[in-house]
Amino acid sequence: RQMCIRDSIQGAHIPYEGAIGTSIAKVFDMTVASTGLPGKRLRQAEINYMSSTIHPSSHAGYYPDAMPMSIKITFDPKTGKLYGGQIVGYDGVDKRIDEIALVIKHEGTIYDLMKVEQAYAPPFSSAKDPVAVAGYVAENIITGKVQPVYWRQLRDIEMENNFLLDVRTPDEFSLNTLPGAVNIPLDELRDRLDELPKDKMIYTFCAVGLRGYLAYRILVQHGFEKVRN
């Protein structure tokens, strides 16, 4: 806004391209950031969209002080055009939201996220940066490598016709899980496929997302047609 006023006063004819609403705030020890259009705004505008959510670390896990973050992006389910992104975390949130904002500003897609080049060293990032991973997950959704289910859909399902498969370890399962879930650890899944119903929709899940996705792929490759992750 200030730049537009300055240019007008000076007589410069520089077109204003508009803003995409990028913001960031410190909330106690956490950082919250947003850019572009979130799902709520897209639904209000009746724009068809899909979303992907990941929970990576701020940098390589083997390097000390890696902190968790959650990244959600919204995108067009056909073209992959990137609509928006939100991030909640502790460290590295600012640079990730800036990367997503830059792609949106240039009318980019989730495929551009996959190709963004970042500086890498273990104290600062991972070999596959979280922004790129968000793009990979979105690409998996668009190409049908995985069919996601969102919490809004899952909260209303009837257990009689559905099967919740928790693929975490028994120790993780003992701490907490979803009501009615059955625990088959990912490492045991291939040997215990006969315990799963083929006449029910199976929802795979884990703590973060990777193991749930791998379980989904295992089931699909073994002939299970009713699977969501």
Q: What are the language-model segments listed below?
A:
Residues 28-35, 43-145:
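Flexible, glycine-rich terminal cap/loop adjacent to redox cofactors
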Residues 79, 169, 188:
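Short, glycine/acidic-enriched loop or turn micro-motifs at the edges of active sites
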Residues 163-168, 184:
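Short hydrophobic beta-strand that contains or immediately precedes a catalytic carboxylate
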